[in-house]
Amino acid sequence: MTMSTARTAVRSLESLGRVHFIGIGGVGMSAVARIMVARGVPVTGSDAKDLPVMADLAAAGAGIHVGYSAGNLGAAEAVVAGSAIRADNPELQAARAAGLPVLHRSEALAAAMAGDRVVTVAGTHGKSTTTSMVTVLLQGAGLDPTFAIGANVPSLGVNAASGTSDIFVAEADESDGSFLNYRPHIAVVTNVEPDHLDYYGTAEAVYESFDSFTELLPADGVLVACADDPGARALAERTRTRGNTRVVTYGTAEDAQLRLHDGGPGDVWVSTGAGRFALDLQVPGRHNALNAAAAFAVALELGVAPDAASGALAHFSGASRRFEFKGEGRGVRVYDDYAHHPTEVRAALAAARSVAGDHKVHVLFQPHLFSRTREFAADFAEALNAADTALVLDIYPAREDPIPGVSSKLIGDRLSAGGRLVAAEDAVRAVVANAAAGDIVLTAGAGDVTAYGPLIVEALLAEAPGG
């Protein structure tokens, strides 16, 4: 599929009337529904399974259905359809037959944003964590933003809430071009790399979409871009040349306007024209230090005093599936990460290495999408070779059909001596056999590899003395 940069006119919540969500149990869909319910919009929704978040939405006042049926639409005046909803879904077919407006999740979220000062976080990697950090930092500084995040955040308790201020913080997903539906006042871009080429077709189209995104910023807005990332840095330079908005850069680069020093845990600080300020971070990794610097920059743009901003992340423990601690057994600590791009795998393994110290790092990786594996097989292998052992599962297909000649073997053939392919039924045993006390185990990928973390912890505990 090639990219379309057509932008939808932003609707108001009032214009939508009663809203029905098809696929309401998804992380992104439930976030929008939660905000709409809190803002007084009559909401109903359905999903194929009875997911935990649906009980929360029902308790908040939404009408919830398990299973899909045309009758679930009720008196809906607008419909929001999740990206995984098929064209033959009976509710979607009924909505179209009735002439109801059918919105993408991003269009519904844009309607919820209308009238607020909007902060969006975009980028190939780090969106969920950075959006979470911005939200936690603003809350810690005494503000109460509305927020919508594409991951569950233990520090916040939920992935979305309607706040009392006029600030709206949201993750902006570039994977299908839908981030062009937002109208941000502050736009953070953590990095820009070719990805989602199944949608965009070419790397150039990816870069063009980010240019279109920054063109949405008003004259009194600001682009906050990472000076350490070549793609984000080039975007900042093009935006400055275009001159439609201000640009603020952050990072360890000498010319970054907000300069980051990352000396490891306990030695992270940023310097601005107002001085030098320590960042109290509990999450490891250079990538998280950069994410924190971006959040700090946003806080300053919103008028938060630097001293108030610097300590506000002390209790941030990370977002779900972002180097998330799953447990420990036999002295081996197990973490899980959503990393599904070579850059993300490198960052997650670097964080694991910083935690492991002199001990070993073992990774169980599940490639995500045939198209991504074909495009980045060599880069994945290079990234995985940073681990002491790397076990690679079969590709998680998600929305794709198989591509002839594309399998995990494309990665496996390029792994160093510590790496090999592993069958799903052998994965837990193989990981446990590799790990010794003090080591770190990382499960990585955007598919169901996340289910292996608890199983590995359970197996390690069974082998522990008294287990």
UniProtKB/Swiss-Prot annotation:
Record-linked InterPro entries: Mur-like_cat_sf (IPR036565), Mur_ligase_C (IPR004101), Mur_ligase_C_dom_sf (IPR036615), Mur_ligase_cen (IPR013221), Mur_ligase_N (IPR000713), MurCDEF_pg_biosynth (IPR050061), UDP-N-AcMur_Ala_ligase_MurC (IPR005758)
The keyword Cell division is annotated on this UniProt entry: yes
Keyword Cell division on entry: yes
GO biological process: cell division; cell wall organization; peptidoglycan biosynthetic process; regulation of cell shape
Catalytic class of the enzyme: ligase
PANTHER family, A to Z: UDP-N-ACETYLMURAMATE--L-ALANINE LIGASE (PTHR43445:SF3), UDP-N-ACETYLMURAMATE--L-ALANINE LIGASE-RELATED (PTHR43445)
Family to which the UniProt record says this protein belongs: Belongs to the MurCDEF family.
Protein name as catalogued: UDP-N-acetylmuramate--L-alanine ligase
Native source species: Arthrobacter sp. (strain FB24)
High-level lineage: Bacteria, Bacillati, Actinomycetota, Actinomycetes, Micrococcales
The gene coding this protein: murC
